[in-house]
C-alpha cells in the first residue's frame, strides 16, 4: 500500500503480481513503476492516450522531484504550466499537489519511474540537461539545497561542490543539510 500510495489500480495490480511470486514480501518491497503489469497498465491507460507532444512533456517533467509552474515554464519552455497542472489533475495523470496553494507538484512515484525509464530509453541525454537547468533555476532563487541535489543527480559533483563551498557557511548557520 505504501508503494502504491493508495492508487486503487496499483493495489489491484500488486495483488495480481503477488499471486505468482515465490516471495510475496520481497515482491511488494521491490515493486516499481517499471514492473511488467504496472508498466503495461500505465502505458496503455496513461501514456498511449496522450498526443506525442504531451507525452514528450510528461517524460521530461518526470526528471523533476517536484515542480512548480514557474520552474516548468522557465526550464522546459512551457507557456502556461498552471493550466497544464490543472489539466493533468483533471485527467488523473498521477499528479500530486504538495502544498495547499497548489503551487508545487510531483508525479506518483510509480508513474514517475515509468516516465523516467522511457525518457532514458528514448532520449538518453535529456535528463542531465533538465537536471542542470533545474539546478540553475534553484541557484538563481537562493535554493542551494535543491540545486545541489539536482547537480549530484546529474553527475555534476564538481559543480555541486562549488555551490556547497559558495554557500556552505550560510547553510550551516541555517542548519540546512543536503
Model-found features: residue ranges?
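Amphipathic alpha-helical "lid/sensor" segments that cap RecA-like P-loop NTPase cores
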Residues: 1-37, 52-56, 63, 77-78
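Short acidic (Asp/Glu) and glycine-rich catalytic loops that position anionic groups and cofactors
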Residues: 21, 113, 160-162
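Short, amphipathic alpha-helical segments that act as regulatory/interfacial helices
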Residues: 1-19, 62-65, 73, 89-92, ...
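Short, polar/flexible loop-turn hinges at active-site or ligand-entry regions and domain interfaces
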Residues: 24-28, 78-79, 119-125, 171
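Extended alpha-helical scaffolding segments used for macromolecular assembly and cargo binding
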Residues: 123-178
Amino acid at each position: 500500500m505504501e508503494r502504491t500510495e493508495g492508487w486503487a489500480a496499483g493495489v489491484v495490480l500488486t495483488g495480481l503480481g503477488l499471486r505468482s511470486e515465490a516471495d510475496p514480501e520481497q515482491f511488494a518491497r521491490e515493486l516499481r513503476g517499471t514492473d511488467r503489469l504496472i508498466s503495461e497498465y500505465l502505458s496503455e491507460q496513461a501514456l498511449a492516450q496522450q498526443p506525442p507532444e504531451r507525452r514528450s512533456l510528461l517524460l521530461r517533467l518526470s526528471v523533476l522531484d517536484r515542480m512548480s509552474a514557474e520552474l516548468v515554464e522557465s526550464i522546459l519552455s512551457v507557456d502556461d504550466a498552471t493550466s497544464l497542472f490543472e489539466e493533468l489533475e483533471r485527467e488523473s495523470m498521477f499528479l500530486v499537489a504538495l502544498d495547499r496553494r497548489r503551487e508545487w507538484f510531483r508525479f506518483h512515484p510509480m508513474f514517475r519511474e515509468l516516465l523516467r525509464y522511457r525518457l532514458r530509453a528514448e532520449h538518453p541525454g535529456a535528463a542531465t540537461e533538465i537536471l542542470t537547468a533545474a539546478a540553475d533555476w534553484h541557484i538563481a532563487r537562493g535554493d542551494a539545497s535543491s540545486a545541489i541535489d539536482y547537480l549530484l543527480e546529474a553527475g555534476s559533483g564538481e559543480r555541486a561542490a562549488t555551490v556547497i563551498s559558495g554557500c556552505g557557511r550560510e547553510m550551516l548557520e541555517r542548519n540546512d543539510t543536503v
